[in-house]
Amino acid sequence: MSQFVLEIGTEELPARFLPALERELAERFTRALADAGIECDPVCVMSTPRRAVVRMDAVNPVQSESEEVVTGPPARIAFTPEGGLTKAAEGFARTQGVEVADIFRLTTDKGEYIAVRKHMGGARSIDLLRDICPAIIGALPFPKRMRWGSGDFTYARPMRWLLALFDESVVDFEVGGVRSGNITYGHRIHGAGPLTVAHAGDYERVIREQGGVTPVGEERRNAVVTGGNTLATAAGGKVIWKDSLLDEVQGLVEHPVPCLGNIDPSFLELPREVLLTSMESHQKSFGVEDAEGRLMPHFLTVLNLTPLDGDLVRKGWERVLRARLEDARFFWKTDLASSFDAWLASLDNVIFLGPLGSMGDKTRRLEQLCAWLASEVGFDDATAAARAGRLSKGDLVSGMVGEFDTLQGIMGGIYARRMGEAEAVAAAIAEQYLPAGPDSPVPSSMCGALLSIADKADTLAGCFGLGMIPTGAADPYALRRCVLGIARIILEHGLQLDVRGLFAKAFALYGERAWKLAPEDALVKLDEFFMARLRNLFIANGYETLLVEAVLAAGCDDVRSAGARLEALAAFSRRDDFASAVLTFKRAANIIRKQGGDSDVALDGAWKADLLVEDAERHLAASLEAMFPRFDGLWAEGDYPALFGLLGELRPVVDGFFEGVMVMSDDAALRTNRLNLLQALVGRLSRLADFGALQM
């Protein structure tokens, strides 16, 4: 077996590009090699800011061979009466690239045809890779591409060299004006190069030992963590690792060297969030804390070289960070000298969304919507909820959030505490943007949960009213995240809340607006949008698609109820008699769906006892009369597992009804009475789930 390596050398790529680049290279090479019939071990991909590497340690030097029988026209067309070949046969041979002497007769189920045997494969893998490599490189997707020089080729950053070796041979091709070879370049300081790689198997040794490059991202990450922990422990603390920043940092360096710096202890008067954000956002550095979780006057940064004078480099980093922290301290002191009243006045000059007014208007709507929500869910501190809604956006015009926009809400909560607001108000302001994503927690406080719901509902109503409905991947106002956030908060806090009523209230608080969609039409579209996202959320949480759709078809305005019904139905589906129950109740639902609309008499679920002539229908009627009070009581309590248990008890009776009674009797009165019996049953069933949607 042979070895292959491809290195795409570029100017520094953004760290955020590297994970997707590795995935694309692995998937595309794996697929291309399989399609070409080249057998090889799994494709290994590595990347640094200046290179993307594809390596295969065991590649078959020759393409897999096979023989294929290609069928041509029928023999009656291919041969003349005298047995010679017709022009049709000659054309077939020419098309297949074979001699006419290679044609033979092939008997099939459909008759006799002519055919040829074609030898497939057997090409040298290196020759196939000459076409595969440039095709893949040119098709790699990036969030942004650029041109350089005078050519039209585009890539994420200018391409500077290409190394492509199959064992000791160069895989010769050209991309973007760059021709492949056996030359690579190492770290700009520790092994700039050019470096010659004699054999594909030597690449990693050369780039590590001569080039001073750590090509594997996970190794760079581990080096940062191990070295950083050692330095922090020696200083009596521990590093505050942040995974997203750690991933970014390892993608910024080829030769990671952790470095512990110091900050003036006087800066520790700043809020923890401000200090960490200053370090992380501007300097790509990590904070250090003691065993009690208090910040220490240190920070950890990562260098891209081993410095000759470590103290000099450290002091340079300290000087730059000090300037950032001085700015933060200035904003902190300036903001504390202001007030929420001043900020709220300024919000009237900050546009929310075009025709939807100012951020000041939004806070006044949130004040009312939070108070309404508190009443709807039975929260006993509506005053705090309303106050949180009014103050929620004040920090947007503060100096600190102007500098560090990721601190919006967080700084509002900090300032609210410093300015004497109730703890519930301050906590709610700090939590208003939660959850920030699928892995982000929801607000922990009830006041924060209500403010977050109100904020998201207000944005959804406004955007849908203006026709700003997400399509495809485009969602500039993160409306999908808003919907999922509302659903998660309701589910995780167990709130009994009618979301349709919530959206209707949010629309009403806008008053008269120049909507592009009438509020009633926008509400319908918003309901559909919410239901689709809720469906995705339940499926992502591990529930079967059919169960989710059956529950949502029974109604999802009360999200808590939908979630509880789904959990109960999932448990019911694990019972041995589930399939039988579904078939029984689905039959009832389908009869009502099909026949109910065709009945001459409207079905209201009220049957007449004197028209119950068969024992089976009298038994069903008696069972329903006994079951309905229990059902309604359990429904009021929200005891859905017990409700599905009732259905299990009722199933044999319904089966007996179907076995012993002709529902569609020729007697119209009997037929309508029996349909009403089923309507009464289905009316209760349809509150739990749409059994007609289940497939068994």
Swiss-Prot record:
Keyword Electron transport set for record: no
Known catalytic reactions: tRNA(Gly) + glycine + ATP = glycyl-tRNA(Gly) + AMP + diphosphate
Known EC number: 6.1.1.14
GO cellular component: cytosol
Broadest EC class assigned to this enzyme: ligase
UniProtKB keywords: Aminoacyl-tRNA synthetase, ATP-binding, Cytoplasm, Ligase, Nucleotide-binding, Protein biosynthesis
Subcellular location: Cytoplasm
SUBUNIT field: Tetramer of two alpha and two beta subunits.
Annotated HAMAP family: Gly_tRNA_synth_beta
PANTHER family reported in the protein's UniProt record: GLYCINE--TRNA LIGASE, CHLOROPLASTIC_MITOCHONDRIAL 2 (PTHR30075:SF2), GLYCYL-TRNA SYNTHETASE (PTHR30075)
NCBIfam families: glyS (TIGR00211)
Protein name: Glycine--tRNA ligase beta subunit
Originating species: Nitratidesulfovibrio vulgaris (strain DP4) (Desulfovibrio vulgaris)
